[in-house]
Amino acid sequence: MKKTHITEQKFADLGLNPQVVEGLEKKGFEFCTPIQALALPVLLSGQDIAGQAQTGTGKTLAFLTATFNHLLTTHAHEGRQPTQPRAIIMAPTRELAIQIYNDAEPLIASTGIKAALAYGGESYDKQLAKLQGGVDVLIGTTGRIIDFYKQRVFNLNNIQAVVLDEADRMFDLGFIKDIRFLFRRMPAPQERLNMLFSATLSYRVQELAFEHMHNPEHVVVEPEQKTGHRIQEELFYPSNEDKMALLQTLIEEEWPDRAIIFANTKYKCESIWAHLAADGHRVGLLTGDVPQKKREKILEQFTQGSVDLLVATDVAARGLHIPQVTHVFNYDLPDDCEDYVHRIGRTGRAGASGHSISFACEDYAINLPAIEEYIEHTIPVSDYDSSALIQDLPAPVRTPSARNQQRRTNTGGARSGDRKSNNRRPRQPRQHKEA
C-alpha cells in the first residue's frame, strides 16, 4: 500500500477510539483524503453530514471509521439483544455492499464489532445464520434488508448510526420507497448519527437528507476536473458497420492489461462479448441478470488478471472497487452524461494514468454535446483509416442463455498474439475539435 497522502491530517490526531486507529494503521492508513479530513471532524462532534464525493475519494473509509468509532464510544441501548443491529449501511447494489463489507472486516477485526451482509441473489439461509449469530453493523441492499425485517429476524429499534451510500444511485434504481420504509422504522433522526453520501447533492437528495436527518452539514469535495487529469480521453466517429472492427483493432494496438468495455444495453454487451470470445480474448461479461455468484467470480477473475477484458453495462460503473484498470472503452456513449464520468473514472485511479476511448456512432453521437458540456471540455478526436481495420474477424460465438451464465467467461483461450505482430495503426493524425 502506498504511503502517499493528499492532506496533512492524520487519523491519529482526530481523537478517534484507539481501536479504530489501530485498525486503520494495520491497513496502512495514516493520512486522510480530503473527504475524510472534512467529514470526520464533523461526524466525531456528533453532527450529521450529507457528503458529495465521487467514487474513489475515500468516502467508504470515512463513513466506516465514523460508524465504528460511534459504536465504540456510545453505549448500546439498554435491553438490546445481540441480533439487533446498532448500525445500518445501505448500498444501491450487491457489489457495492460486498465491497463495503470487505473493507469493514479488517478494520473491526480486533474490536469485537460484528458485521453482517444482507443482499439479494445469494443464499437467504446463509445470511440468516450470520444474522442470528449476532450483528452490530448490518450492510446490504434495501430489498433483502426489508425481507429480513418483515420476517422479524431483527428490528431497527436499536439503530444508532445510519449510512446511505450513493444516494443519487438509489433514486436512479427506484429504491427510494424502500429507504423511506426503513428510515421510518428507526429511532428519530436526532437519536442517531446519520451519514449520506452522493456523487451529486441534487434537490431530491437534499430533500431526502432534510426529511430523514437532523440538521446535516453539507460537505463537498469537488474534483479539479470531473474526468481526472490522469485520464487520456480520445474520441472516434465510427460508422455502425465499423464499430466492432475498430474496437478489436484498437484493443490489439493498445494491448490493455485490464480494460472495461461499456455498452448501453444487455443485448449489445452480449454481442461484444461473443465477438471478443470468438477472437480468443480472455473476456468476461457483467450485466444485470448474471447470477450473483457468477458476478463475483467474474470480478475476482478480472481483478486477479485471469480475465483481461470486461464487457459491462453501467452496473459496473459505480461503486465497484476494481484496481489497476488501464483502459475504458465506451462502445456506446452513455445517455446520462454523469455516467460518462463514472465510467471513465474506473481508470486513472490511485495516482495511475489511464486511457478512455469513446465511440460517437450513428446511434449515440447525439449524446456527445451534453457530455462535453457536463465535463466542461471537448474530447480530443482521432480519425481512423477503414482499410487499416482488422478484416478477418471470426464469426461471434453463440451467446449463452441466462441459465448457462457460467460459460460466459472465456478464460481458456490465448490472447490474439499473432495479430499484434501485424502492427496495424488505424489512427490518423489527431484532429482536435475547437473549444
From Swiss-Prot:
UniProt keyword Flavoprotein present: no
Record's compositionally biased regions (Polar residues): 401-413
Primary location group: cytoplasm
GO cellular component term of the entry, any: cytosol
Localization of this protein: Cytoplasm
Keywords per UniProt: ATP-binding, Cytoplasm, Helicase, Hydrolase, Nucleotide-binding, RNA-binding
PROSITE patterns, per database record: DEAD_ATP_HELICASE (PS00039), HELICASE_ATP_BIND_1 (PS51192), HELICASE_CTER (PS51194), Q_MOTIF (PS51195)
Domain spans labelled Helicase ATP-binding: 40-219
Cited Pfam families: DEAD, Helicase_C
Motif (DEAD box): 165-168
Binding residues annotated for ATP, in chain numbering: 53-60
Region spans: Disordered: 395-435
SMART domains xref list: DEXDc, HELICc
Chain's role: DEAD-box RNA helicase involved in RNA degradation. Has RNA-dependent ATPase activity and unwinds double-stranded RNA.
Record protein name field: ATP-dependent RNA helicase RhlB
Taxonomy of the source species: Bacteria, Pseudomonadati, Pseudomonadota, Gammaproteobacteria, Vibrionales
